[in-house]
């Protein structure tokens, strides 16, 4: 158990060191920033929190199943248009909604999110919401209708 934890921390450190060595240029293995764009603002995926994206990329690696991003960054206008919550973490670039194809993928995605320290997770029938908004309750799960 301790060895597994140490290996996990070493992998996290590797991602951080790569980011530093590359002059803080974010390099994602599994995502393009455009996947996180608000539909009404091309290029807005660049407003996503970089540390969150690194964690999400690492979670994708651990899960070994595709993470199709349904929603990443949202402008306030787009958030209102789709009926998003006022104060949504998507507006801050701290949240993503990941499509999931079934129970097995859902379990793998949630497990991998927890492994990288993403502990705010909402579970819907066809998607998983995850965020790292420190201004909200931590270590929480919720269900969507």
Regions found by a protein language model. Name each.
Residues 67, 96, 128:
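A broad, low-specificity signal marking well-ordered, structured residues that form hydrophobic/aromatic
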Residues 43-46, 95-99:
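The substrate-binding groove and active-site-proximal loops of carbohydrate-active enzymes
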Residues 87, 91-92, 100-145:
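Catalytic cores and adjacent binding grooves of peptidoglycan-active enzymes
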Residues 27, 78, 87:
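Glycine-rich, flexible loop/turn motifs
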Residues 57-83:
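Extended, low-complexity, intrinsically disordered C-terminal regulatory tails
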Residues 1-65, 134, 143-145:
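Extracytoplasmic cell-surface/polysaccharide-interacting catalytic and binding patches
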Residues 62-64, 91-95:
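Short connector loops at helix/strand junctions that flank enzyme active sites
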């Amino acid at each position: 158990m301790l060895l597994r934890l140490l290996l996990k921390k070493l992998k996290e450190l590797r991602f951080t060191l790569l980011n530093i060595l590359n002059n803080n240029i974010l390099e994602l293995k599994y995502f393009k920033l455009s996947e996180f764009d608000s539909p009404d603002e091309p290029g807005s995926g660049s407003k996503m929190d970089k540390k969150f994206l690194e964690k999400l990329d690492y979670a994708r690696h651990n899960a070994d199943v595709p993470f199709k991003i349904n929603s990443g960054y949202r402008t306030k206008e787009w958030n209102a248009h789709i009926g998003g919550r006022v104060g949504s973490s998507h507006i801050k670039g701290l949240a993503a909604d990941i499509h999931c194809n079934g129970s097995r993928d859902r379990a793998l995605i949630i497990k991998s999110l927890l492994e990288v320290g993403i502990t705010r997770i909402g579970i819907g029938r066809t998607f998983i919401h995850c965020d790292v908004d420190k201004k909200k309750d931590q270590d929480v799960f919720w269900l969507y209708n």
